[in-house]
Amino acid sequence: WGLAERGIAVVRYEKRTKAYGAACVPAGRELDYDTEAVDDAVAIVEQVRALPELAPDSVYVLGHSLGGTLAPRIAGRSKGLAGIIILAGLARPLEDALEEQFYYTSSLTDSSVNVKAQLDELKQQLANVKKLGTEEFDETISLPLGQPRSYWLFANAYKPVEVAAKLKLPIFVLQGERDYQVTMEDFGLWRSGLLRCKNAYFKSYPKLNHLLQEGSGKATPFEYSHASPVPAYVMDDIASFVRGKQNTL
């Protein structure tokens, strides 16, 4: 509602894997970033641009977390976008972020032998998935997160910052400095990778976690269970970007 209150029309929808689970993959396709998220976003952009109430050249894509990571790909496959907004978008390989995330959360809650064994198993899986598509890949080791081979092949091949750098449209990257899932390291990679893009803008927020909730100290998963709206100053920044007032960011 924050953007709508600022006069910006918004279309939100459930990611198809959340809404339909395994049934979301079309016949003849495999689960990957496109079938999970990109295809639907591209279709929605096309539908929104066709609405008579809106100027077709005024449509932006805003993505959070995986949506932010995929925003450059969505833009590359869409026609006539005005810009993209990346909220807490991962810039590093997914397996690297997962390993860091699981070690972080385990350090907050449990250091038992059982948890250590689980982490060691995950580390082995993540190291192995980097070898997917090579002779060194071990078929006897399970793939992380229960995702299929097609998903990880796609994830390994996708380079979000490189894709974003080739776009000829405004980009706004926002990041919470207390985020342990997508970190300031990712923010730095976006910033350095888009250094030559004159229409790329960046802003980080000291108090915000991955869900853009305010807090202090080390962020924890328990924060997510408390309802907390995105702060007005973040909404103001997004609205300014959409209205072309980048000099105020």
For every predicted segment, state its role:
Residues 177-179, 206-209:
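Acidic beta-to-alpha connecting loop that harbors the catalytic carboxylate
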Residues 208-211, 216-249:
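Catalytic active-site module of serine/aspartate enzymes centered on a nucleophile-bearing elbow/loop
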Residues 2-8, 12-35, 105-106, 213-224:
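Cap/lid segment of the alpha/beta-hydrolase catalytic domain
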Residues 167, 173-175:
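Short beta-strand/loop motif that positions the catalytic acidic residue
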